[in-house]
Amino acid sequence: MNYKLRREKLLEMLPEYSITVMYSGVAPYSIGDEKYPFKVDRSFYYFTGIERENLYLVLIKLSAAKSSEMLFIEPFDEKMAKWVGGKIKEDEAREISSIEDIRYVQSLQDDIFYYIHRLGQANSFTLCGNLDKEEISQKNVVSQLFTDFVKADPSLKVKNIFKEIFILRSQKDQEEIEVIRKAIAVTKEGIETMMANSRENIYENELEAYFDFTLKCKQCDHAFTTICATGKNATILHYSQNNQYAKSNDLVLCDLGAAYQLYSSDITRTFPVNGRFTERQKQIYDIVLRANKLVRQMAKPGLTLAQLNNAVIDFYQKELSAIGLLDNVKSVRDYYWHGVSHMLGLETHDISISGYPLTKGCVITNEPGLYLEQEGIGIRIEDDLLITDDGCEELSSDIIKEIDDIEEFMNRYK
């Protein structure tokens, strides 16, 4: 990944006399001296390639021709390295990020003030940050830093550069697309392993374990917490207990994904635990599958995610009426209450702006579903789409989803 080029593109979008600060984040404590696993701020990672705690990226733009960049790291501690592993060293940080100017976090505020007061002269600096981020560490640390600076110098302005970062991150380059393809390929293998080992009376978390094992073998992480829901549990959108056993004739809804080099895949497949769909299951599944294909045919530059979702609702209105599921009381939203798509990338629900049109290079999900709680049927079919010049490419097309293909595959192992 060309992190330097990404920083250059961001700097081109920023005002003169601006200082941009990004923070990598820090893992909070869960209980006692035990920490949650660290998850780097994805925008910090996007511009540096470094996945370490408590680092700062600082970009300074004085003019179109004059800018500089600095990375602030923690000093290496030999004693702590023996207990929890070493902090990143200057040479390693320089090699990964291509940032030559490596400094220590202890000098962060003083160094920024130096640029403001020595170089700003009569110009008022603008402090730029990704201030719409939901990560608590990012919002608290950078916002508080800016608050302190403005208190010390009220002439400073603050600019939220969430949109600029979104524009860059939403348009995936070829390297990013290939990494996402890899994540999807591993997800495919995991789903097929689940299908091959599915049987009635199997526990949901036992099926889930086959996916977990696949990820471990392929040196991948989970993109998000796996949903492995059987029967009525599949009508709960974000079901996560995964601790019930599957009865004969149950469907299994598995919403899961591998993460490779931090890039997520997000796939959902629904299959019969015993390898055979009932006629009613086939009827509902076919409607969802056709909705999935409708979105794939429609997705292209210029459309919004809301337009794709509205098309699915209109399609369901006609199809559900035809099979008697809609009346004066029941509406489509009684059977389908989520959106059909979200952005995908370094985050499973990747950085996005509501109503922003799709552009070439965006990767989105395509996940229509129907949930008939009274019948114990929950079906969702989710694929990952790459927006191209005039349409889209289904990156997950190799993962089977036709009824006949699923039954044929599963019954090889019965």
Which sequence ranges carry the predicted segments?
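Active-site neighborhoods and metal-handling regions in enzymes and metal-associated proteins
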Residues: 1-414
